[in-house]
């Protein structure tokens, strides 16, 4: 076999990647475990041979691992030729020795698969290619030597942990060494295995011939199943016979190593968990190997159920592995290859049918697992070895039945379907990959196109160790259905086969859930395969009976119309989830890649339906916009001023300058009201100013806020006010005084009110009214005087800007609350009469204070505003004093206005405590009513 397999080392470059020799070393020890289990069953000679064969098979399985084909399938091919082929030749009625050989081979295979699976990522290293070359050049003797070396190395490491590490490194090296060789060996062994274990599943049965065809490129020496199988059988027989002596020594060494390494195996698996996970198939195979090789007797016991179960799916494989191995090792080229090439639809339909006949155990073996079990207690182990393959294959047989049903669409691609099947064998797990590809075809790939794809990609898989690369790429790409999906699917399917032993019951439920599991739809075959693998336990019987049929139904998606529609829809849907239809194969063979891509895509899809990450309702701001309040209040003031009549205000803004022009209307009302009647004008004044501004805002801030109220804004106000004073105020002394304190004092609510105040400044009558308040607030007079002119100049602009929105709002609110009393007092009382009525005097005062000075007296003014009110009306009569009265009047009115908290409340402006006190608001109310 090695000689036969060595010719294809040209494929070895890619195959070499797949075949890890390093893994073979632990595999030997693992085989020792299997051999130990079989030694108990007195299979030492055969096991030695099998072990030697397994070493070869390790290379083959490693190359298969690189191909993405489960190494397990190859090992059975090698071992089956000796035992299973003998069983096939001798019928299912071989003694337990062949079956135990199968167990040994299976355990070894599984371990080999797991060992080789771990280093698959490392296969690329290929450090000791010279060894692999020498190995290919050298005979089985060198393989014996290597087996001995491996056994010695396995036993040599002092500590289990260090052994695990050393074994891992050695396996890496050996994998790299045997990469080329393993690939050369892989195809014939794979084809043998496919013929033996693979043929039971007609996809594998088909695959062997085609597998040999793709294998023939890799290995022209083994172009056909029978040719490669018979040489392989002969070689394994010779190998096992020739090495039986050394194999016993190796067995003892491997026993020691395996005993020593049974823990290291676990440690190794743990250490190599990442690699095993990366090669999920091998990880699951390792688990199976650990399960089957530690439990080969259990597996034998389970094979009765597992033979039932696995032989339901797998015993067709097993029976086909034996009988079909006989018929398909002998027939495979004619039966499998002929059927698929001749008519993939008939053969695949005959896959379900022929495989129902050879696999007749397949369809009939769910019904006749017992017969197969009776016949296949030996194949049961073959079923184990073929469980990986046959479970994988049996899912394809189920897939093969659907695949044959699919074969109807695939029939047009008859040879390509055979290629798919061959790629299934090539990939080793690709019966399920074929099922995946068949389901891909079912999903939406053109039946012909997908098989052709699969065939080409299968060749690529064989030619390339790209299976590993495809594995890496496939989870992401997943678009290339044939190559990567099959390759990845086969390992992934192996994962599912092995990992989904628990899946077996879910598999049937999955069959029921088939429409729901979109990925599982395509994963049905893998799930069936998983179930088969998992159902080596009696659970598997349920699955072949229930789930085994549903997977064909899933695979039958093409054949069975309703199932086809269901399966087609979900595969198409799952195809939508993956980049392309290959995803359903990924669902089968590439569970992890499919999950990866599917998770991302599903998460994306879910995200679409989900609320955006930042879906939070922003609570609307309840606070009124100062600008809006100012606008509203200003409009109200303007309307009131207009009602009062805009007189003399036009001249004032020009004197004040462009700044004052903004507030012309308010000053006009104030001016007009001032000259007409200081008392009434001031109340009207206040009403205009207060109703819009004070009412809108509650009393927020005192004069202190006004004084504190601005940085640059206050400075700008002060400067503007000083300028305004220069133009508007005749008395420079007051202007200067106002200029100094005004920046802070004028900034508060008085500023906006200063908008109205400019009229007071502009009109002498207003200024006299302001003058008495100034006298009242002597402490604030300079500040108020300073603030007044500044408000007159600066407030007009910035009072209406939202800078001082609080004061306008405050004034309107206060105006409304105090309007009635203020109106009555201001109306009925003359400026002096209003002096006893603080509201009226405040009205007179606020007119001017708004104009300029409310800020300075703001806080103190509320208390002083009452006397200021009395003084304010008196000075209202003194209105003739224009400049200084204006400032003083501004001061006093501002103080009342500040006593009215509304202006102070009007945000930055509420500088006047008099307004905060609410004095002005009261006065304004009368003035408003006076309107």
Swiss-Prot record:
Keyword terms: Actin-binding, Cell junction, Cell projection, Cytoplasm, Cytoskeleton, Glycoprotein, Methylation, Phosphoprotein, Synapse, Tight junction
Compartmental location: Cytoplasm, Cytoskeleton; Cell junction, Tight junction; Perikaryon; Cell projection, Dendritic spine
Low complexity bias locations: 214-232, 569-580, 816-841
Highest taxon in the source lineage: Eukaryota
GO cellular component, one term: cell periphery
Keyword flag Transcription: no
GO BP field: positive regulation of actin filament bundle assembly; postsynaptic modulation of chemical synaptic transmission; regulation of long-term neuronal synaptic plasticity; regulation of postsynaptic cytosolic calcium ion concentration; spine apparatus assembly; visual learning
Residues spanned by motif PPxY motif: 551-554, 570-573
Gene Ontology molecular function: actin binding
Phosphothreonine, modified sites: 549, 771
Listed Basic and acidic residues bias regions: 136-148, 373-384
InterPro entries linked: Synaptopodin_domain
Chain intervals with Polar residues compositional bias: 153-164, 188-200, 282-293, 309-370, 556-568, 874-895
Region (Disordered): 56-78, 113-243, 280-420, 542-591, 691-711, 775-918
The keyword Phosphoprotein is assigned to this record: yes
Region forming the signal peptide: none
Residues where Phosphoserine is found: 134, 202, 222, 258, 490, 514, 569, 691, 742, 746, 767, 835, 856
Processing after translation: O-glycosylated.
Tissue: Expressed at high levels in brain and at moderate, but still significant levels in the heart, skeletal muscle, lung and kidney. In brain, expressed in the cerebral cortex, hippocampus, olfactory bulb and striatum.
Modified residues (Omega-N-methylarginine): 850
Induction: Depends on the long term potentiation (LTP) and the activation of NMDA receptor signaling.
Principal location class: cytoplasm
Family under the similarity heading: Belongs to the synaptopodin family.
Subunit structure: Interacts with BAIAP1. Interacts with actin. Interacts (via PPxY motifs) with WWC1 (via WW domains).
Reported function: Actin-associated protein that may play a role in modulating actin-based shape and motility of dendritic spines and renal podocyte foot processes. Seems to be essential for the formation of spine apparatuses in spines of telencephalic neurons, which is involved in synaptic plasticity.
The name this protein goes by in its record: Synaptopodin
High-level lineage: Eukaryota, Metazoa, Chordata, Craniata, Vertebrata
Gene name linked to the record: Synpo
């Amino acid at each position: 076999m090695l000689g036969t397999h060595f010719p294809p080392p040209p494929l070895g470059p890619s195959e070499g990647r797949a075949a890890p020799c390093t893994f073979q070393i632990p595999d030997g020890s693992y085989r020792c475990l299997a051999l130990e289990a079989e030694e108990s069953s007195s299979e030492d000679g055969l096991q030695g041979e099998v072990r030697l064969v397994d070493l070869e098979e390790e290379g083959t399985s490693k190359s298969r691992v690189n191909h993405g084909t489960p190494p397990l399938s190859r090992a059975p091919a090698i071992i089956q030729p000796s035992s299973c082929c003998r069983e096939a030749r001798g019928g299912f009625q071989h003694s337990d020795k062949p079956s135990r050989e199968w167990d040994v081979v299976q355990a070894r295979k599984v371990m080999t698969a797991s060992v080789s699976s771990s280093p698959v990522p490392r296969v690329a290293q290929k450090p000791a290619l010279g060894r692999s070359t020498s190995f290919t050049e050298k005979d089985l003797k060198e393989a014996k030597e290597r087996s001995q070396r491996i056994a010695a190395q396995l036993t040599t490491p002092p500590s289990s942990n260090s052994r695990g590490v050393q074994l891992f490194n050695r396996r890496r090296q050996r994998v790299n060494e045997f990469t080329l060789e393993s690939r050369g060996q892989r195809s014939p062994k794979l084809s043998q295995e496919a013929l033996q274990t693979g043929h039971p599943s007609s996809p594998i049965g088909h695959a062997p011939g085609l597998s040999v065809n793709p294998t023939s490129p890799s290995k022209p020496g083994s172009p056909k199943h029978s040719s490669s199988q018979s040489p392989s059988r002969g070689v394994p027989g010779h190998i096992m016979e020739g090495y039986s002596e050394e194999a016993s020594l190796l067995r003892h060494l491997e026993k020691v190593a395996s005993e020593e390494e049974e823990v290291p195996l676990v440690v190794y698996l743990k250490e190599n968990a990442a690699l095993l996970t990366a090669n999920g198939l091998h990880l699951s195979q390792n688990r199976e190997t650990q399960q089957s090789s530690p439990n080969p007797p259990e597996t034998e016991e389970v094979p009765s159920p597992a033979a039932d179960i696995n032989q339901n799916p797998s015993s067709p494989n097993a029976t086909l592995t034996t009988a079909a191995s006989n018929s398909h090792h002998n027939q495979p080229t004619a039966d499998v290859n002929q059927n698929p090439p001749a008519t993939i639809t008939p053969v695949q339909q005959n896959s379900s049918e022929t495989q129902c006949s050879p696999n007749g155990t397949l369809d009939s073996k769910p019904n006749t697992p017992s017969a197969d079990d009776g016949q296949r207690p030996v194949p049961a182990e073959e079923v184990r070895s073929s469980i990986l393959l046959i479970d994988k294959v049996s899912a394809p047989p189920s897939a093969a039945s659907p695949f044959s049903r699919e074969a109807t669409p695939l029939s047009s691609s008859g040879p390509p379907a055979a290629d798919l099947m061959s790629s299934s064998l090539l990939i080793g797990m690709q019966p399920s990959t074929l099922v995946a590809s068949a389901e891909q075809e079912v999903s939406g790939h053109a039946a012909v196109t997908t098989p052709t794809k699969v065939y080409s990609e299968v060749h690529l898989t064989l030619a390339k160790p790209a299976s590993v690369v495809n594995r890496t790429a496939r989870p992401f790409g997943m678009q290339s259905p044939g190559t990567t999906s099959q390759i990845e699917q086969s390992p992934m399917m192996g994962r599912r086969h092995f990992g989904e032993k628990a899946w077996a019951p879910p598999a049937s439920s999955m069959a029921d859930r088939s429409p729901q599991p979109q990925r599982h739809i395509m994963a049905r075959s893998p799930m069936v395969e998983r179930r088969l693998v998992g159902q080596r336990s009696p659970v598997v019987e349920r699955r072949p009976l229930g789930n085994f049929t549903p997977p064909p139904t899933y695979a039958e998606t093409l054949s069975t119309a309703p199932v086809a529609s269901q399966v087609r829809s979900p595969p198409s849907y799952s195809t939508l989830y993956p980049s392309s239809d290959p995803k359903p194969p990924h669902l089968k063979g590439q569970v992890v890649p499919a999950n990866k891509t599917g998770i991302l895509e599903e998460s994306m899809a879910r995200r679409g339906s989900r609320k955006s990450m930042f879906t939070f309702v922003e609570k609307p701001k309840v606070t009124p916009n100062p600008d809006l309040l100012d606008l509203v209040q200003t409009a109200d003031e303007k309307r009131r001023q207009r009602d009062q009549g805009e007189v003399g205000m036009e001249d004032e803004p020009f004197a004040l300058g462009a700044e004052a022009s903004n507030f012309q209307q308010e000053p006009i009302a104030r001016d007009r009201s001032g000259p007409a009647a200081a008392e009434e004008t001031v109340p009207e004044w206040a009403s205009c100013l207060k109703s819009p501004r004070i009412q809108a805002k509650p009393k927020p801030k005192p004069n202190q806020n006004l004084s504190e109220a601005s940085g640059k804004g206050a400075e700008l106000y002060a400067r503007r006010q000083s300028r305004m004073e220069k133009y508007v105020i005749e008395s420079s002394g007051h202007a200067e005084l106002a200029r100094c304190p005004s920046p802070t004092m004028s900034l508060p609510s008085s500023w906006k009110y200063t908008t109205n105040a400019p009229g007071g400044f502009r009109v002498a009558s207003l200024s006299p009214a302001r003058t008495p308040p100034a006298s009242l607030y002597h402490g604030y007079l300079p500040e108020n005087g300073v603030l007044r002119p500044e408000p007159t100049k600066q407030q007009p602009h910035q009072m209406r800007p939202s800078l001082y929105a609080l004061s306008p709002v405050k004034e309107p609110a206060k105006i409304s609350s105090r309007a009635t009393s203020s109106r009555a007092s201001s109306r009925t009382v003359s400026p002096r009469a209003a002096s006893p009525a603080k509201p009226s005097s405040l009205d007179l005062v606020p007119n001017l204070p708004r104009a300029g000075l409310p800020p300075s007296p703001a806080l103190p003014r509320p208390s002083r505003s009452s006397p200021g009110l009395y003084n304010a009306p008196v000075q209202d009569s003194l209105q003739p004093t224009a400049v200084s009265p204006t400032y003083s009047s501004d001061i006093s009115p501002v103080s009342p206005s500040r006593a009215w908290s509304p202006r102070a409340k009007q945000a930055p402006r509420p500088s006047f405590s008099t307004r905060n006190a609410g004095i002005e608001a009261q006065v304004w109310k009368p003035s408003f009513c006076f309107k």
